[in-house]
Amino acid sequence: MKMKLLQVHFVLLVSSSFLLGYTGMVTAAILSRPQVVFVEDTCRENEIFSQCQASPNCEKSCDNIDIWESVPCIQTKSCVSGCICEDGYVRDKNQGVCILENSCPRVRH
């Protein structure tokens, strides 16, 4: 297995000679089949890396903070790896970042 050091946020390993990605430093193995590889050091401020998290649709956010604990989430996958908000933080989907729960913009009705 050949190893390469890449400056990417994620690596889409399509073949041994074709890679796609964004910012962040990772070590990627060139594998024989396509797959997406996320690594811990690509997480942003107030995020932590999780090898196995619920579907991203189930992440606590400013949009669902009031009903998050009372309404079950329908997961699209049983387990995915990636960055999640640290405890006490929720995803602000407008900006895509994790902010303190009490910093969520208030919705006016």
Curated annotation (Swiss-Prot):
Disulfide bridges in this chain: C43-C83, C52-C79, C58-C73, C62-C104, C85-C98
TIL domain location: 43-104
Site note Reactive bond, residues: K77, S78
Domain of life (superkingdom): Eukaryota
Subcellular locations according to the entry: Secreted
UniProt entry keywords in alphabetical sequence: Antibiotic, Antimicrobial, Disulfide bond, Fungicide, Hemostasis impairing toxin, Protease inhibitor, Secreted, Serine protease inhibitor, Signal, Toxin
Signal peptide as annotated in the record: 1-28
Tissue: Ubiquitously expressed (at protein level), including in venom glands. Found more precisely in the epidermis, fat body, gut, muscle, and venom of worker bees.
Function according to Swiss-Prot or TrEMBL: Dual role peptide that functions as a broad-spectrum antimicrobial peptide and antifibrinolytic toxin. Inhibits trypsin (IC(50)=375 nM), plasmin (IC(50)=2140 nM), and microbial serine proteases (subtilisin A (IC(50)=294 nM) and proteinase K (IC(50)=459 nM)). Exhibits antifibrinolytic activity by binding and inhibiting plasmin. Does not inhibit chymotrypsin, elastase or thrombin.
Family: Belongs to the serine protease inhibitor-like (TIL domain-containing) family.
Name this polypeptide is given: Serine protease inhibitor
